[in-house]
Amino acid sequence: MPIHGKLNIERELMTIGTYVKEPGHHWSDGVARGEWSHEPFDYGTWVDIETGYTCAIKRNSSGSWCGYVFAGAEHPIHGSGNLEHGEPVWLDVHGGVTWHGEMQVPDVNVSGMAVGFDCAHHGDMSPRDSVAGRMYGEYRRASYVIGEVRSLAKQVADFRPVQQLVG
């Protein structure tokens, strides 16, 4: 049964929920117990009190957390002069920026242009890895990802296009 609610994440309340668990189609199917078992939700959204940006964390198909900052289509970070291989440059976040484009968290009606990252890199432990008996690497808990999203939101808020910095 899906859960929905609020979680206190220090300065804000995060709206949380779970995806509908269709047998054979949920990241947790057959997954061994681990640190992720103490995080019974699949996504969370909040408005960052410091920047005013809508932020989100959500699990991918491997059960790893991904983090996103919704900066709005007009934000200068989306300008073509600020991209390298389609991703914003000069942002320091876990594993680097791996998402830049339209994103949605449909269960809570959050959507728009977002910058994001994932925690499924070499050295990261994904819950689905346990199905194949791989239990190495470091699992990045939701609390870690929330901290990275907050840092990313501040970097996006402070972002200035290169031409403004040089000219």
Predicted regions, residues:
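Charge-rich, low-complexity N-terminal segments
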Residues: 2-56
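Generic low-complexity segments that are intrinsically disordered, proline-rich and/or Lys/Arg-biased
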Residues: 3-5, 24, 77, 89, ...
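Compositionally biased, intrinsically disordered low-complexity segments
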Residues: 6, 12, 34, 60, ...
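Generic signature of intrinsically disordered, low-complexity, basic-rich segments
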Residues: 11, 27-28, 40, 47-52, ...
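Amphipathic, interaction-prone secondary-structure segments
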Residues: 34-87
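Polybasic, proline/glycine-rich intrinsically disordered low-complexity segments
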Residues: 44, 79-167
